[in-house]
Amino acid sequence: MRNLAQLPPGARARIDGFGSGIRPEVGRRLRELGFVDGNVVRCVRRAPFGGPRVYAVSGAAFALEMHVAAHVLLGPADGDDGVRG
């Protein structure tokens, strides 16, 4: 299963939950921000040298470090294969 850290800029995907290694407080905060099962997320841009990426979800944009984004599991967005076209 893909994770959010693997989503290329411009691509969309549906959130399918969190990996088992995520700390409970991090998962709780991500859910508060809109990273909830079924929501569609889009990678807006990435910072150079492996820095944080900016993701749009629930009408807002958030920067997440790669090690946090790696815990957000993804499936294809409805009508989308998750790949930029």
Language-model region placement:
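Short, acidic/hydrophobic/Gly-rich beta-strand patch recurrent on exposed beta strands
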Residues: 16, 34, 54-57
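Short alpha-helix capping/helix-loop boundary micro-motifs
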Residues: 23-29
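C-terminal structural segments of small proteins and small subunits
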Residues: 11, 47-50, 54-85
